[in-house]
Amino acid sequence: MAGAASPCANGCGPSAPSDAEVVHLCRSLEVGTVMTLFYSKKSQRPERKTFQVKLETRQITWSRGADKIEGAIDIREIKEIRPGKTSRDFDRYQEDPAFRPDQSHCFVILYGMEFRLKTLSLQATSEDEVNMWIRGLTWLMEDTLQAATPLQIERWLRKQFYSVDRNREDRISAKDLKNMLSQVNYRVPNMRFLRERLTDLEQRTSDITYGQFAQLYRSLMYSAQKTMDLPFLEASALRAGERPELCRVSLPEFQQFLLEYQGELWAVDRLQVQEFMLSFLRDPLREIEEPYFFLDEFVTFLFSKENSIWNSQLDEVCPDTMNNPLSHYWISSSHNTYLTGDQFSSESSLEAYARCLRMGCRCIELDCWDGPDGMPVIYHGHTLTTKIKFSDVLHTIKEHAFVASEYPVILSIEDHCSIAQQRNMAQYFKKVLGDTLLTKPVDIAADGLPSPNQLKRKILIKHKKLAEGSAYEEVPTSVMYSENDISNSIKNGILYLEDPVNHEWYPHYFVLTSSKIYYSEETSSDQGNEDEEEPKEASGSTELHSNEKWFHGKLGAGRDGRHIAERLLTEYCIETGAPDGSFLVRESETFVGDYTLSFWRNGKVQHCRIHSRQDAGTPKFFLTDNLVFDSLYDLITHYQQVPLRCNEFEMRLSEPVPQTNAHESKEWYHASLTRAQAEHMLMRVPRDGAFLVRKRNEPNSYAISFRAEGKIKHCRVQQEGQTVMLGNSEFDSLVDLISYYEKHPLYRKMKLRYPINEEALEKIGTAEPDYGALYEGRNPGFYVEANPMPTFKCAVKALFDYKAQREDELTFTKSAIIQNVEKQEGGWWRGDYGGKKQLWFPSNYVEEMVSPAALEPEREHLDENSPLGDLLRGVLDVPACQIAVRPEGKNNRLFVFSISMASVAHWSLDVAADSQEELQDWVKKIREVAQTADARLTEGKMMERRKKIALELSELVVYCRPVPFDEEKIGTERACYRDMSSFPETKAEKYVNKAKGKKFLQYNRLQLSRIYPKGQRLDSSNYDPLPMWICGSQLVALNFQTPDKPMQMNQALFLAGGHCGYVLQPSVMRDEAFDPFDKSSLRGLEPCAICIEVLGARHLPKNGRGIVCPFVEIEVAGAEYDSIKQKTEFVVDNGLNPVWPAKPFHFQISNPEFAFLRFVVYEEDMFSDQNFLAQATFPVKGLKTGYRAVPLKNNYSEGLELASLLVKIDVFPAKQENGDLSPFGGASLRERSCDASGPLFHGRAREGSFEARYQQPFEDFRISQEHLADHFDGRDRRTPRRTRVNGDNRL
């Protein structure tokens, strides 16, 4: 995600060491030193550990002793090394005299593959030791990233092997190998498959050495991918069945490949080709005049970064392109730069500023509020986000501003401070930033903004500016007051709502405005604490064993238990190839209170008694009298690390044998329940997360039936020998599977929460089943389609008595309140009354009223009407609310108050706080708002109009002077290049469209504009930046901490120039005739056509526990008329080396200067949902052609280790010699693509919401699903569904 910034904090770094010093440094780091580790967890005190560098794997490891590694980080993940105590890990111990290390003895390693980096905070024994580590690691970081791909593969292989071979015995078992391959996304169908491959490698023993493992890897990769459509190999007659190491690609053949297939002009020089091959291979035995590739090495080259699709020459900044005015550039810009997560409870962090600046961001935001001691603080105002000091932020900016780029940085000041604190801000700007702060114009006589070259290493202030001659005065603000901005809220924070099913209290985010209370869906109560989750202390240490997979309880009476144990161990070890030492523990059949250890050795099962005794009232456990343990768990853990010793053998306990039938005693398991019965049970629990597991009729088969998104769904679970399979995820047992999905989502965001059986139904079940939940229920093929139409739920009050005429109608009296009403066409509605659920009643017998159900409004209105945006669950009108404190509390919560509404009888919302003080503050403020709601709203609107500015701060504003946007000034003499305007995305959408896009582009040619996410994006999600970019907006500010598609597009835009943060807009955008939404206005720009074939992939990341089933989506994103998507088929169960059949995908691009080629790898899960795996996005103008590797990145745009696609790509002019469009252009292209590749999405639906893309194809697909679902529903449902139209019954 970050650009190529220097690893040292100040950007300079130590001078490069000599070759001799490198050897000395590497040897010293490999030996290691003892240093003190300062933890990020408050519960852990600093500890002394041995730190070493493992050169074979390029990792830093630490341990207490010599034989057990406690932790490791990959050097390739290190982003920065800072000298001194420059992390919060040191701050936690400032008051502890035992841990006050000398500043010069400390350093911090920042590493990770996400926006928020992790820290390794260390205290060495001397300053020389610190320098040794910093110099050595700085060299290793660069050397590791620049290493040739074969060397990177070698290091990766050793890392995988050593992760299993922890004792460094240079051998692992076949079972370990099978598990390892599963971890790297390769399915081994059975042990026989491995034994056959190992036989090919002349493997004769039960263990595998590293050399054999490496050879197996080469064999697996080549054998799977030699079938790819590579004409060069076919032409070279290298496709025969010989082993790849016996086939060679000579230097002349490789040179021919580079020239003819890759179009590499430099390859005409034979010496350059020779040098390239030698640097790639790094093999002393092939440092000869004519080096060569073995065939599998050549295929590895095709997938390598050395064969990238991106033209790396564009990574360099071209100074000649940096002489235009700032308004001609796209400038990398951050919104809410200080945040590390969401906008209501995450942490404000100095590290976020450092991270953004080192990623090349050139416009950052400072949200300033009055703080203590006369100095402002920075945070997201009136929220739970933490606060940081303004002065600390300035020091961080100074330190990191020009590490990644020397081009100017713009500080966008969101100022909420008093005049006094504004003056202090101005003073600190000058004091801290010094000469880098721009305080006067570059050229007074200029008629436009200065260029990036003119502003090198300068920091500009964006802030409102006073009129000439004012000491301070009020100026108009361009930001309208809005109740929906969380910064304008009266109070907000975490409160708790009771779950009506399990009566647990769950956190929700509440916002009190001048007229309403908004509350979110269930959220996390963690308020952005940087600390890692503290480990939970186990209660009852003597019972720790009960949840371990090796504990089987009582297996049988008498000798039955012994026989059952022997059978379990024998079946498990023979089937899985488990090693000696595999074991289980069971209750003793003959000695009450004792246990029996049964284990596998030399093909037989042996048994050992575990004795127990009481010692001072507490139990003790032992095998021999001289070594006693406090718990059975401690005893087993000990012998997993220390060998069992007796006269005949010495052996560690190795692999626990899982329980096979433990699920039968669980409350969620049903041995004899049909699908229909399961559905009927779940229909009575209208809560997502309700679930049960049932045995299916097919052998070794189960089903999880659950509720999600209001619907009942099912998924199959298959028992395959000793393994339980859910989709392609493997578990040791059904209990392990359920336990895993109680902690992780099973379907979208749904976790298994409420186990359902008859006892649970009696407590929480409704009287009437929810038949609506059976939409999709009868068709196992449709698991994921949501409700076909959103329904508006309300409450109604009866105007007359009504007596039901049929069984599916309600009976009610005048003034009855009918809840949860769904309005239907034809004069008949459905609702809940008198214990009856969703029965029919005539709509002309009732009048609508406010109801609790109506508090959850339709999604279309959420973004516009709520400060919580998509997180909104409910809203209450404060003047209509009545507040009552519950002194007695409720259900284990002491601090509870109730909110009721006079218009809704017998309804209240119980809300819990964490403390009495918090409860009283909420109650007080809600009551105050209820009395003064109208006055508060009027006051807020009055305050919006004027803002006081200190002269000292105003004088620091030179070029970026925010003013209200005035469309009438565009193109006139009144337009001033020093003025700029800011727009929330919703306002910007009014200008970046076909009607006004050309006019807005005219504005941006002279002046700057900044666009930022709307305030309702509390989850810090981002908007689509493409329409803003093509209309010339320079400062399109995004949440850098959010790993979504807009940020990935942003990273792609600034690829050119090596993430320097400035990209010159195409010259066509400075053509006054150019219209961003009209391709006929493209003058002097040649359209192009692209043809792509996806051939294969390597080292795709895993998503969860299963082996992925990947497919690739290829997208051209850019101008509205160019946008189009296509996708491959999916490959079953292979993420290590999948291959796709040759199929060309064609794209025609009218505006290649503003077009991106985007690859996204998804996996298709068991619900036919697509889950993100990896992506790569490039500007089209920087693509190379031929057989090219596409290096893949994660969602944070960080490079994934060795992950890549192999594609064949051709780019050619879209116009033929006679001037006509090529056969791959225009409508014919789209038609051909539809015929060739199945699902195709094209043309952005930019009318209305900018995020409502490609909706028509999805809508068509949804309708076809509904039709098919209705077919199954009508075929399988016993009772026909009836609707009413105009009073008539319809079947």
Curated annotation (Swiss-Prot):
Residues 320-464 form the PI-PLC X-box domain. The active site is at residues 335, 380. Residues 152-187 form the EF-hand domain. Residues 1071-1194 form the C2 domain. It catalyses: a 1,2-diacyl-sn-glycero-3-phospho-(1D-myo-inositol-4,5-bisphosphate) + H2O = 1D-myo-inositol 1,4,5-trisphosphate + a 1,2-diacyl-sn-glycerol + H(+); a 1,2-diacyl-sn-glycero-3-phospho-(1D-myo-inositol) + H2O = 1D-myo-inositol 1-phosphate + a 1,2-diacyl-sn-glycerol + H(+). Residues 27-142, 489-523, 895-931 form the PH domain. Ca(2+) binds at residues 165, 167, 169, 171, 176. The SH3 domain mediates interaction with CLNK. The SH3 domain also mediates interaction with RALGPS1. This is 1-phosphatidylinositol 4,5-bisphosphate phosphodiesterase gamma-1. It comes from Bos taurus. The lineage of its organism: Eukaryota, Metazoa, Chordata, Craniata, Vertebrata. The gene is PLCG1.
